[in-house]
Amino acid sequence: MRYEFSAIEKKWQAIWQENGTFKTGESTEKPKYYVLDMFPYPSGSGLHVGHLEGYTASDIIARFKRSRGFNVLHPMGWDAFGLPAEQYAIKTGTHPKITTENNIRSFRETLQAMGFSYDWSKEINTTDPAYFKWTQWIFLRLYEMGLAYMSDVDVNWCEELKTVLANEEVDEKIADGYTVVRKPLRQWVLKITAYAERLLADLDELEWPENVKQMQRNWIGRSEGVEIDFELRCHGKNLRVYTTRPDTLFGATYLVVSPEHPLAEKLATADNLKEVKAYISRAKLKTELERTGLQKDKTGVFTGSYAINPATGNPLPVWISDFVLISYGTGAIMSVPAHDSRDWEFAKKFDLPIIEVIKSPHDVNDAVFEGKESVPVNSSNSEITIDGLPFREAFDTMASWLEKKGAGKRTINYKLRDWIFSRQRYWGEPIPIKHYEDGTLRTETILPLTLPDVEAYQPSETGESPLATIHDWLYGSDEFGSFRRETNTMPQWAGSCWYYLRFIDPENSGRLIDPEREKYWMNVDLYIGGAEHAVLHLLYARFWHKVLFDLNVVSTVEPFRKLFNQGMILGEDNEKMSKSRGNVIPADHVLKTYGADAVRLYEMFLGPLEQVKPWNTNGIEGISRFLGKVWRLVYPEQEGNKAELTDETMPEELLRRLHKTIRKVTEDTEALKFNTAIAEMMVLVNELQRNGCRNRTAVESMILLLAPYAPHIAEELWQATGHTGSISNEPFPNYVAGLATDSVVQIAVQVNGKLRGTFSTPAGTPQNSLIETARNVESVMKFLEGKAIMREIVVPDKLVNFAVK
């Protein structure tokens, strides 16, 4: 009988669906395991082979955990609001809902064809009113807590998309060729900064890749510093700056304020006012990326004003420059050009003084010196000296002196900014707020607030969304008076901030999640997805989860216990897959050619899951041959009958190979080292074939090991060996520890660390016997002759090393 993968895969997918094989158990008696993919945006281009990698990994773990006795929750859904569907609607007039439904259908068919063991009864869609009712509910709780507010802010405005971008989205859009400018708009903003300290501290409790945790730490950007007041001459006011280096105050030679600083224009003297106004106008057209790039040419304008350095009494010129951001610190800095590279470049360009106040190995007029390891110099006055003190002591001494004088105070700052939450588009969750004629805001009392149908999807030239044109939806009245609904919608990130909770209880119409179900299932045990979401989705979801924790909706302080980032699969040309490069490998194509089991195995065998690796068609053909070998363990002849499996005793060597394989595959699967687990199974299959093994335990154990990886062929062979139930309900094989090691081991013998011989011995041979045998290995004896053995080092079952003199 031939291995006809297409018929076999369709057969078992139908059986799984009909029997509800992967439906999540309702009982809470078993230990739980919640394994989750970052759910996809259903784009029109469909899934390619790179998308399948993470989904395959999570499915292997889901199947493995079921076979180990866990109650597994493994769901799938759709992050379906977003710009692409709206842009397609603008071009074609097709409602985004229709486009989204078609795309979801295509995605679902591909995922089902891969044999992924999702519980499809848990499927969710962020555009479903029954779902976004609760997204809106969370927004209203944020509003009631003072964490959602309206503010006039300079936003990142994309001219082509006619919408606002979050700070975290700007780099990607510029890289894609879009134009992004700064523009003042009244926006909804979420106060994520209120949770900055908790978001930072709780990272230490997570089993996440260190690089992702560090990216979040850097984005939050906690810094300890001092706010220092510089008295402005001729103004009778103070200019407050923030610095993390109060120990360098004696070296401050000028101050710089942001173009948006409330004093910026007021600081300008009559002679400088025109130039200052022009500079401020130009700065407002730039994005933060353009303003803060390390390689950008420094620009600035002198205001004509001076401020007094509280440590030296010297007057310092006050400049305006766009490299200072109003959103960080106080929007004003003291510049110490000798010990800060940006300040040094600015001082050189505008011929400003450079004073050494940290002992430097070179002339600071020739090059900046930024080291904290050196000590202060030239840093004393009649009241204080910090010369010669180490950094921490100098910092504290200076901070205490400033506080005592009333000229400064210690403070903690964050680079993290509040989250601009509004979007000027149609295809998003409506924000459930009503604006009344007297200026008051009230919340919608009935949720969900759904989207009306519109004839045109284009944002207006003024920046308002298409909702502003739907009069019947926009205006209304109630007992509080006439109102106008909010026309901004939520960003795409809103629905993905909490979807992992809804998977637990997707049909609940009365509450976001049942408390008992939440306590059982949370938090997510394994979350698999790309590292590109480190400071977007992952940070936003953690923020919302902490808010829900404070509201007693959830019982855990973090949503995702363990995070794993899969590496990217490149095209065969070693480049990232993209339509523009023409190197995209559609998932449907390889599924039709090689089958789901081959694709699953190949993607996991390519290399370590976390590494970037290229697709190679020759490699998947090799995997197909391996599956053919597995098939022939049960169907040895192409057209013949099944093999007769027996209970004959296996040779000890083969028995040990079987148990070593079970142990290795178990440990590697648990650790997501799928490539080495597959390699170990290949070795076992070769050994079974070489020995002509027909032992039932050996063959069935091999099929059980393969089941999480290649479930369709495993189901078919399990049935062929006489079993009536699904292999998906069978326990994973166990190994006997004593058999999971070699009976005879090879011992390396070294003299002073150099290999001089080897010998074979039974595993577990005592150390004294190993030493005695090693002394008498013929090739070793000549290196010991006439030498004093100073030390004998033994690694059991591996090595004996003689240290001689």
Curated annotation (Swiss-Prot):
Q: What is its EC number?
A: 6.1.1.4
Question: Could you state one GO biological process linked to this protein?
Answer: leucyl-tRNA aminoacylation
Which CDD domains does UniProt cross-reference here?
Anticodon_Ia_Leu_BEm, LeuRS_core
GO MF, one example: leucine-tRNA ligase activity
Q: Which reaction equation describes what this protein catalyses?
A: tRNA(Leu) + L-leucine + ATP = L-leucyl-tRNA(Leu) + AMP + diphosphate
Primary location group: cytoplasm
**What are the annotated disulfide bridges?**
none
One GO term describing the cellular component: cytosol
The entry's localization annotation reads:
Cytoplasm
Q: What class of enzyme is it?
A: ligase
Name the Pfam families on file.
Anticodon_1, tRNA-synt_1, tRNA-synt_1_2, tRNA-synt_1g
The organism's superkingdom is given as Bacteria
- What positions does the record give for the motif labelled 'HIGH' region? 40-51
Q: Which UniProt keywords apply?
A: Aminoacyl-tRNA synthetase, ATP-binding, Cytoplasm, Ligase, Nucleotide-binding, Protein biosynthesis
Listed binding positions for ATP are K579
PANTHER family (UniProt xref)? LEUCINE--TRNA LIGASE, MITOCHONDRIAL, LEUCYL-TRNA SYNTHETASE
Q: Indicate the family of this protein.
A: Belongs to the class-I aminoacyl-tRNA synthetase family.
**Protein name (Swiss-Prot/TrEMBL):** Leucine--tRNA ligase
Source species, please?
Chlorobium limicola (strain DSM 245 / NBRC 103803 / 6330)
